[in-house]
């Protein structure tokens, strides 16, 4: 069962024994879903970063006490105030002070079902954020030169999210690629080809090369214990005359989040979304926007085969080489999201409805 630690701030004028009885309604409701532990503010340093913490404003008159412990407060500062003992007024004062110093703050107050629903969301967010800690993202090669606004500061990203970007030279991939024979990937190629709706471009030789590349990258993922990777695919084409599209598609099917162009922000987005929702996404380029009809056309080449209803084997759009995947998606509602900023502290999010699953180029 999930545990919530309520860091309690109460005025000395109120007896500790009455703390529970004064807030019986909210505490009993929380205990239906969580193990609730009341922690005196003086003991909050005993809690770890894996403990989910809420600041419990139990009474009024604690404003100065809370701000004296500003450095030790959990972030973001979630303040629970049920309104009893003048707690809401105190929470509003504290929240205003915190926000004035650039600290994110939220007050949980109102009807009990609404508070519980919000706690569920916050707990899920916390758990997703903790699951990112220690995750390793492989940067195979270097980001494409045209990604001028997609940089990530490795140190700031690690400090903020606990993730590690690991630079891996393309030479590691080339070495494994040369060691994998055509015979080793023959059966896998036959399986991918037989399940395709059609094969518009690409030769059997192209498919074999693309599958050898998949095996080579998978090997490096295992060696480096990667949860995700981004691949400098255009540099790769110059060296081994194949594209990474199929490899990245199959890696996504394997549960290893994979993106192209060495895009550091997009691969973090895929990893964060998987941690939060448990669902896979895929990278895509906005190809055309019609603001009058509110339509967006997205181009893709690395979608996981499992995410499609059917797929068509194509070649790589820009170079007309290798193998790429044209996925036919089910119609319905989806979310488009992009995390950005050098320390990954910004995001764009929008709901979208897929009305036309595929449009051939």
Tell where the protein language model's regions lie, with residue ranges.
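Short, glycine-/small-residue-rich phosphate/pyrophosphate-handling segment
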Residues: 86-128, 275-303
């Amino acid at each position: 069962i999930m545990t919530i630690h309520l860091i309690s701030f109460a005025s000395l004028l109120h007896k500790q024994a009455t703390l529970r009885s004064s807030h019986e309604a909210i505490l009993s409701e929380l205990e239906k879903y969580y193990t609730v532990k009341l922690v005196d503010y003086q003991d909050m340093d005993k809690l770890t970063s894996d403990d989910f913490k809420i600041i419990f404003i139990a009474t009024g008159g604690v404003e100065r006490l809370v701000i004296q412990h500003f450095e030790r407060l959990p972030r973001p500062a979630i303040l629970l105030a049920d309104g009893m003992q003048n707690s809401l007024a105190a929470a509003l004062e504290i929240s205003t002070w915190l926000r004035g110093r650039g600290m994110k703050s939220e007050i949980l107050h109102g009807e009990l079902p609404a508070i519980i629903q919000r706690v569920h969301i916050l707990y899920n967010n916390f758990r997703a954020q903790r699951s990112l800690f220690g995750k390793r993202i492989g940067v195979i090669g270097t980001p494409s030169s045209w990604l001028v606004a997609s940089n990530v500061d490795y140190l700031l990203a690690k400090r903020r999210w606990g993730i590690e970007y690991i630079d891996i030279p393309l030479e590691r991939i080339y070495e494994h690629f040369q060691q994998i024979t055509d015979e080793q990937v023959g059966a896998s190629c036959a399986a991918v080809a037989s399940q395709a709706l059609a094969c518009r471009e690409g030769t059997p030789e192209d498919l074999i090369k693309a599958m050898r590349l998949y095996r080579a990258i998978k090997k490096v993922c295992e060696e480096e214990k990667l949860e995700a990777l981004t691949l400098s695919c255009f540099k790769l084409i110059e060296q081994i005359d194949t594209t990474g599209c199929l490899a990245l598609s199959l890696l996504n099917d394997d549960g290893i989040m994979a993106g192209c162009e060495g895009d550091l922000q997009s691969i973090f987005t895929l990893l964060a979304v998987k941690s939060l929702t448990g669902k896979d996404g895929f990278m895509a380029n906005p190809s055309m926007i019609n603001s009058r009809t509110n339509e967006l056309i997205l181009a893709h080449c690395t979608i996981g085969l499992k995410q499609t209803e059917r797929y068509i084997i194509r070649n790589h759009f820009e170079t007309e080489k290798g193998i790429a995947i044209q996925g036919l998606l089910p119609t319905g509602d989806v979310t488009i999201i992009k995390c950005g900023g050098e320390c990954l502290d910004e995001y764009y999010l929008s709901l979208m409805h897929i009305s036309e699953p595929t449009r051939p180029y």
